[in-house]
């Protein structure tokens, strides 16, 4: 694991080439087809060196939850082990790692009719009124969820209306944790400044590779919009807004790089409190040797 632009893919490919391993992607952007440049999806050459599972498995119009990931990852892990190989999970979506390692609460699936009903109430009365509803049925979640966070607020109310139980009550029960021995590594530069520079460099390379054209093609489909999880991925939202004329090119670059740096900051916050984690420095010589030594 590690923040964006920290060198996870390069190390994973080295591991896959030199040892009997297969890579499973743990990345909420790489699951989407047609989102290659802005997600820093491994190139065709890199995928030939080390195939990645759970890449290009969803259309950008579709949703994909942590529960979906857990089910898919468990299936892939079992298959890789049955082949006599070692699965290597690589990515920066910490919620996916957490769901896989610790299990998930038995929450009901989304109900589009109830979601539409909640949205209609919000349009008529405002999200503050719905937040008061949540405070009555689930005061713990109401303290945690801000009235200006409609996605999480809607989900908490939806869960109650489907199940008759609060989100707090349901999240107190989890499925079984991962039934395998796991060695966990994080890779990142020692200095935040270095990571910030890497993020800026990588985004400029994405632009040179045709990222704006990629977003324009997605936009031209007509069925995608900025409220979809796929279009909330860093870089895509800012480029979409640029194409809509909301700001100029330089502002788009500034906003996209800033959003990516904020993502990296959140990822590092998760990792600093992550238990049983072995740290590696980005670009350091001997990372593979250190990793293999820890796995023995």
From Swiss-Prot:
<feature type="region of interest" description="Interaction with substrate tRNA">
    <location>
        <begin position="27"/>
        <end position="30"/>
    </location>
</feature>
<dbReference type="InterPro" id="IPR039657">
    <property type="entry name" value="Dimethylallyltransferase"/>
</dbReference>
<feature type="binding site">
    <location>
        <begin position="2"/>
        <end position="9"/>
    </location>
    <ligand>
        <name>ATP</name>
    </ligand>
</feature>
<dbReference type="GO" id="GO:0052381">
    <property type="term" value="F:tRNA dimethylallyltransferase activity"/>
</dbReference>
<feature type="binding site">
    <location>
        <begin position="4"/>
        <end position="9"/>
    </location>
    <ligand>
        <name>substrate</name>
    </ligand>
</feature>
<dbReference type="GO" id="GO:0005524">
    <property type="term" value="F:ATP binding"/>
</dbReference>
<dbReference type="Pfam" id="PF01715">
    <property type="entry name" value="IPPT"/>
</dbReference>
<keyword id="KW-0547">Nucleotide-binding</keyword>
<comment type="similarity">
    <text>Belongs to the IPP transferase family.</text>
</comment>
<comment type="subunit">
    <text>Monomer.</text>
</comment>
<dbReference type="InterPro" id="IPR018022">
    <property type="entry name" value="IPT"/>
</dbReference>
<keyword id="KW-0067">ATP-binding</keyword>
<keyword id="KW-0819">tRNA processing</keyword>
<dbReference type="GO" id="GO:0006400">
    <property type="term" value="P:tRNA modification"/>
</dbReference>
<feature type="region of interest" description="Interaction with substrate tRNA">
    <location>
        <begin position="151"/>
        <end position="155"/>
    </location>
</feature>
<keyword id="KW-0460">Magnesium</keyword>
<protein>
    <recommendedName>
        <fullName>tRNA dimethylallyltransferase</fullName>
        <ecNumber>2.5.1.75</ecNumber>
    </recommendedName>
</protein>
<comment type="function">
    <text>Catalyzes the transfer of a dimethylallyl group onto the adenine at position 37 in tRNAs that read codons beginning with uridine, leading to the formation of N6-(dimethylallyl)adenosine (i(6)A).</text>
</comment>
<feature type="site" description="Interaction with substrate tRNA">
    <location>
        <position position="115"/>
    </location>
</feature>
<feature type="region of interest" description="Interaction with substrate tRNA">
    <location>
        <begin position="232"/>
        <end position="237"/>
    </location>
</feature>
<dbReference type="InterPro" id="IPR027417">
    <property type="entry name" value="P-loop_NTPase"/>
</dbReference>
<keyword id="KW-0808">Transferase</keyword>
<feature type="site" description="Interaction with substrate tRNA">
    <location>
        <position position="93"/>
    </location>
</feature>
